[in-house]
Amino acid sequence: MRKVEFLDTTLRDGEQTPGVNFSIKEKVAIAKQLEKWGIASIEAGFPAASPDSFEAVRQISAAMTTTAVSGLARSVKSDIDACYEALKDAKYPQCHVFIATSPIHREYKLKKTKEEILDIIKEHVTYARSKFDVVEFSPEDATRTELDYLLQVVQTAVDAGATYINIPDTVGFTTPEEYGNIFKYLIENTKSDREIIFSPHCHDDLGMATANTLAAIKNGAGRVEGTVNGIGERAGNVALEEIAVALNIREDYYQATSDIVLNETVNTSELISRFSGISIPKNKAVVGGNAFSHESGIHQDGVLKNPLTYEIITPELVGVKHNSLPLGKLSGRHAFVEKLKELELAFEESEIATLFGKFKKLADKKHEITDADIRALVAGTEIENPEGFHFGDLKLTSNADDTVTAEVLMVNADGEEVEVIANGKGSVEAIYNAVDKFFNQTVRLLSYTMDAVTDGIDSQARVSVSIENVDTGTIFNASGIDFDVLKAGAIAYVNANAFVQKENAGEIGKAVSFRDVPTN
């Protein structure tokens, strides 16, 4: 049975999601988890975009041991050079070169003829091949490109040395039948004495990304591209976890397998959710909170008698673990550290004291500390802003005029404290007015969402916010976790404002867009 490779582009295409801004440290942590999950290749970024993008690709390259690392490049030699430099430490480097090919892009964006684009493809894939053993080529907006011309494009890239041919449904335009036929036609008609691997790259604008990707696999695709949780611009990308589980459950139909370690799926999904600040919808396939819930009495009865009556995916398959022995108030440091190892949570030795201190505070509030509590505790530590001032504490006072006064304590790494006071019509407004007063920058709150990350009345809460830097239009997401939902919201808002502060200070610069028209 053939095996389908998985390329993850969460760190490149997934970061196109409005408000998602992974730090370099977060990107490396994500890459390590993706490798553990069984991803064959990680598209780590677009090295030519900015110094931060270059450095992220460089650090990820050095950190990977079994997974290939790819960098994106426009059909521009300087982009390919940037990929080469950033990927020098990669054990298995790959370069992904692309150019748009559809009529609308040829006429309005590139202002190039068909023949000129073929010449550009030949020149730049050849150049990339001179620096990399493995080159991937993508004709952007392939599904709106004339099929006969698309074959010419693909053949030109293959003749120039491309090993992987990616067929992007850039705007989520195609249908499963159409997309499957495109793959069938290209695979049957592309000529080469080397093995050429075709891959789908689907966006979900019409809600068909998963179906389209599976149609491509059914028609011969040997690699799939997508993101964890389906994050990405507009309606997002295909969710790789859905493809991995579909291939496992319907192996009989697709006659294909993968190297994805399915019981790492939930851990991978939750990590992306924490770092992106995007909560996983309850009804999300495979990893949503309701994926293994049954409201109907008939369904519940059936599941109790035999889970296969209404569950085609078992919780254990994707890594939903039943809680082992819980910790408690009397649990010591050793037991706590062993629990972190048991749950395979990443931590540095220097972080143990801080984590254990938070655990003891948690134990004072909860009788039993579950695995979910421990994961939330570590997650809360990870998403705090370690640089500059961060949220310390707050005090609220209700006033006679029905307003609320918030006293917010901000603390920096050196232990310096600053207290800011502000009023508001309600608790959240008062807290956020105080934070605004502290940062003294113009932002607009776009969204505020809350969900419970553990079970029970004493559950920890996660608040996710999205704010806009009014001066630049840039959107930033951030999250906060605490027993007190107001404190969780304060943490999230402070973290989001810290991103804005960095952008205003020039630490987050304007990156070159991979959609900018090449100058050569």
Swiss-Prot record:
Taxonomy, superkingdom: Bacteria
EC number from the UniProt entry: 2.3.3.13
Cofactor(s) of this protein: Mn(2+)
A Pfam match: HMGL-like
Subcellular location: Cytoplasm
Key word tRNA processing present: no
Residues covered by the Pyruvate carboxyltransferase domain: 4-266
Record-listed Mn(2+) binding positions: D13, H201, H203, N237
GO cellular component: cytoplasm
One Gene Ontology term of the molecular function aspect: 2-isopropylmalate synthase activity
InterPro entries attached to this UniProt entry: 2-IPM_HCS-like, 2-isopropylmalate_synth_dimer, AIPM/Hcit_synth_CS, Aldolase_TIM, LeuA/HCS_post-cat, LeuA_allosteric_dom_sf, LeuA_bact_synth, PYR_CT
Keyword Lyase: no
Gene Ontology BP terms: L-leucine biosynthetic process
Gene3D superfamilies xref list: 1.10.238.260, 3.30.160.270, Aldolase class I (3.20.20.70)
Primary location: cytoplasm
Region (Regulatory domain): 390-520
Leading EC class: transferase
Catalytic activity: 3-methyl-2-oxobutanoate + acetyl-CoA + H2O = (2S)-2-isopropylmalate + CoA + H(+)
Keywords: Amino-acid biosynthesis, Branched-chain amino acid biosynthesis, Cytoplasm, Leucine biosynthesis, Manganese, Metal-binding, Transferase
Oligomeric form and interacting partners: Homodimer.
Known role: Catalyzes the condensation of the acetyl group of acetyl-CoA with 3-methyl-2-oxobutanoate (2-ketoisovalerate) to form 3-carboxy-3-hydroxy-4-methylpentanoate (2-isopropylmalate).
PANTHER family, per database record: 2-ISOPROPYLMALATE SYNTHASE 1, CHLOROPLASTIC-RELATED, HOMOCITRATE SYNTHASE-RELATED
NCBIfam families (UniProt xref): leuA_bact, PRK00915.1-3, PRK00915.1-5
Family: Belongs to the alpha-IPM synthase/homocitrate synthase family. LeuA type 1 subfamily.
Protein name: 2-isopropylmalate synthase
Name of the gene this protein is made from: leuA
